[in-house]
Design a protein with these regions (language model features):
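Bacterial N-terminal signal peptides that target proteins for export
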Residues: 1-9
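Bacterial N-terminal signal peptides
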Residues: 9-18
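An acidic, Gly/Ser/Thr/Pro-rich helix-cap/linker signature
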Residues: 20-149
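Primarily a LysM-type cell-wall glycan-binding module
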Residues: 288-315
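Short, functionally critical alpha-helical segments immediately adjacent to catalytic or ligand/cofactor-binding
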Residues: 150-167, 227-233, 322-325
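Catalytic and substrate-binding regions of cell-wall glycan-acting enzymes that process beta-1,4-linked
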Residues: 67-120, 145, 169-171, 176-179, ...
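Substrate-binding clefts and substrate-entry loops adjacent to catalytic sites
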Residues: 116-129, 164-171, 179-207, 211-222, ...
Length: 357
């Protein structure tokens, strides 16, 4: 297919600042740091945010407004198919409820969990912002976790990592909803080049995150709290903490390890969220619902495509298209792939037909 060109919008000009090139020599490392600084500036452009650039650096604050398709462009998905089971079994209509019904990680009576739980319960507006960002992607992520038979609590991990912001960028050079640093992202299949950063691609980063968590869980003999701590602070650091406790004759469970302050709060955040979601009625907490149906579809585009042209074919704005496909840095998809776009479910078939003409 021949590319069609359109005048560059301010958004695409901003995106043009975000390319990262990962090489080993010092010059390229300096260029990477320069590009990442520029990406923080582009982050403010993308979010149309009047706050300081630090809002883009500190993703965990959950204050960044991401442009996602609104209710007019992102339908709630296809109707549930009537099956015999539905007459004898309650249909779960909320994705969060679907996930929480299978929560299994134990939640001890620990002051660190209590502190995090207290904060979340006092800030329901934070969860409202998070769920708004999560809405397009939550069903997909839930499905992928279920396919792998992993703990369903992992559906909450993007809240802890990035407040479900695929554009999030931390001071530690971690990017995307799952917050991968460049090296680990590349290690788990996320391409990073001038055109594209797979750490911000929801499909690539979700698959990479679940691959990494599976690897860590195996490394720590099925101990999910150790695996989660390692996801945050690095596998080597957790291994050293375990060895130090063994030498000192101390318990080696997560709660007794000498880990960085951030990591000591990281696992309790996840468990506090799981406890609130599982027991939201007891806490009188209005956790916003997300309908338990698919609302997006991954569409094969076959080759490089101009994003403005793709948005026109899909009948959506360029900002809405980029909100679903935040991995692309430039005016077009990467010539080297991945050759796919995430689109609203109700627009995918018509887009594919128009693209094929």
């Amino acid at each position: 297919m021949q590319l069609k060109f359109f005048p560059l919008s301010p958004l695409i000009l901003a995106l043009g600042l975000t390319g990262c090139q990962l090489t080993d020599n010092n010059n390229d490392n300096a260029q990477l740091e320069s590009n990442e600084t520029a990406s923080l500036e582009a982050c403010s452009e993308i979010h149309n945010n009047e706050e300081a650039i630090s809002d883009c650096e500190i993703a965990r604050d959950g204050v960044i407004d991401v442009v996602h398709p609104n209710d007019d462009t992102l339908e709630e998905g296809a109707e549930l198919t009537d099956t015999p089971d539905m007459h004898t079994q309650a249909v779960v209509t909320d994705v969060w409820e679907r996930a929480s019904a299978n929560f299994a990680l134990p939640i001890p009576d620990d002051k660190r969990i209590s502190a995090q739980r207290k904060w979340y319960l006092k800030h329901p507006e934070y969860m409202a912002r998070v769920v708004k960002r999560a809405k397009p992607f939550l069903y997909y992520i839930t499905e992928e976790i279920e396919k792998r038979d992993m703990p369903m609590e992992l559906v909450l991990l993007p809240i802890v990592e990035s407040a479900f912001d695929p554009f999030a960028y931390s001071h530690g050079r971690a990017a995307g909803m799952w917050q991968f640093i460049p090296g680990t992202g590349k290690r788990f299949g996320m391409q990073q080049n001038w055109w594209y950063d797979g750490r911000r691609d929801v499909v690539a980063s979700t698959q990479g995150a679940l691959d990494y968590l599976t690897y860590l869980n195996e490394m720590f003999d099925g101990n999910w709290l150790h695996a989660l701590a390692a996801y945050n602070s690095g596998e080597g650091r957790v291994q050293r903490a375990i060895k130090a406790n063994k030498r000192a004759g101390k318990p080696t469970d997560f709660w007794n390890l000498n880990l960085p302050k951030e990591t000591r709060a990281y696992v309790p955040k996840l468990l506090a969220l799981a406890d609130i979601l599982k027991n939201k009625d007891e806490y009188a907490y209005a956790w916003p619902e997300v309908e338990n149906v698919a609302v997006i579809e991954v569409v094969d585009i076959g080759s490089q495509v101009d994003l403005a042209f793709a948005a026109e074919l899909a009948g959506m704005s360029l900002k809405e298209l980029h909100g679903l496909n935040p991995g692309f840095n430039r005016w077009a998809t990467s010539p080297e792939g991945p050759h796919r776009l995430i689109l609203p479910l109700d627009k995918a078939a018509a887009f594919s037909q128009a693209l094929a003409k």
